[in-house]
Amino acid sequence: MKDTIPTAETASRRPEPAARGGRPRRRKLTFDRVTFFLAFLGVPLAIFVIFVLIPFGQAIFWGMTDWRGFSPDYNFVGFDNFTKMFQDDIFLKALRNVALLAAFVPLVTLTLALGVAVAITLGGPSKGPVRGIRGASFYRIISFFPYVVPAIIVGLIWAQMYDPNAGLLNGVLTGLGLDQFDTFAWLGEKAAAMPAVMFVIVWGLVGFYAVLFIAAIKGVPGELYEAAKIDGAGRFRTTISITLPAIRDSVQTAYIYLGIAALDAFVYVQAMVPNGGPDNSTLTISQRLFNVAFAKQQFGYATAMGVVLAAVTLVFAALVFLVNRLTGGGEGESKRKAPGSRARRAAAKGGAR
């Protein structure tokens, strides 16, 4: 065995000796480290405080007043606005509606987006290497197109399509022999209004998240799929055992963003059903807030609604993180339970042979 003589280069790569007690020594603050933290931590933190925390604190303050918006005069009323809010039947109906949207829209959208992404990325011929379907780029553009159209335009287009007298949807259904839909009011029937609104929101968002998942799936090592294919795993089994665990963080992030969009959903709903629908069946908190502020000029009360909506959004995000952690998510779990470990072993054996 050849003896090696330590050089300056190898010596510089040696780990620094630990301090007493086994603790590593603290690195000294240098100009480079200070400027790095100021640029990449201090500036974003300052922006967050100025544009998020301070306005939110102001919103809490104005939510405790009877401010009318167009006057400098106001009175401090404490928690009266919040008490009034939870005694307001219309607000409670709006709260139930957004809870329904947050429960179904993310679930349906992500399920469809995952299906589209897997089909485009891994749905190619079963023979040969694992690859996407032919014309994947075309299908990716087509699926993404609804997201490119502004939400207000999407809402107005679908409002015309849902029109009971001259709408395209009723015309198509009637042409197929379903005469009961001749003058059916999709946005005027209590039982149909909310599902119709949900469909439009899902239609407008599913393409974006499909493209997001396509990018995430392409980051999964190809040898995992090849090894799973050698093991005899089908497409469904491969998707459940390899693809989903590998893109779990992307799914979690998408679920949070979709939940926030569903809890708001102001643009889509306001474009299609500006009056809140039959018996307020499609009314959202954002719509109620808008009407209270600008129609009744109760800006203090409306601001209190905004504070509650922000709190509900934070609770939703926290629940998503909690569920993900309890079901095995998180960085630590991903290191202990790496997806496709069996496939990795199979690939390693194949390479050794």
Swiss-Prot record:
CDD domains xref list: TM_PBP2
Organism phylogeny: Bacteria, Bacillati, Actinomycetota, Actinomycetes, Kitasatosporales
Protein name: Diacetylchitobiose uptake system permease protein NgcF
Membrane-topology descriptor: Multi-pass membrane protein
Segment forming the signal sequence: none
SUPFAM superfamilies xrefs: MetI-like (SSF161098)
GO CC terms in record: plasma membrane
InterPro entries hit by this protein: ABC_transporter_permease, MetI-like, MetI-like_sf
Compositionally skewed regions (Basic residues) per UniProt: 337-353
Highest taxon in the source lineage: Bacteria
Subcellular location: Cell membrane
Induction description: Constitutively expressed. Slightly induced by GlcNAc, (GlcNAc)2 and chitin. Repressed by DasR.
Keywords: Cell membrane, Membrane, Sugar transport, Transmembrane, Transmembrane helix, Transport
Function: Part of the ABC transporter complex NgcEFG-MsiK involved in N,N'-diacetylchitobiose ((GlcNAc)2) uptake. Responsible for the translocation of the substrate across the membrane.
GO biological process, one term: transmembrane transport
Pfam families, sorted: BPD_transp_1 (PF00528)
Family (UniProt): Belongs to the binding-protein-dependent transport system permease family.
Region: Disordered, residue numbers: 1-24, 329-353
Domain ABC transmembrane type-1 positions: 95-320
The protein's assembly and partners: The complex is composed of two ATP-binding proteins (MsiK), two transmembrane proteins (NgcF and NgcG) and a solute-binding protein (NgcE).
Annotated TM spans: 36-56, 100-120, 141-161, 197-217, 254-274, 303-323
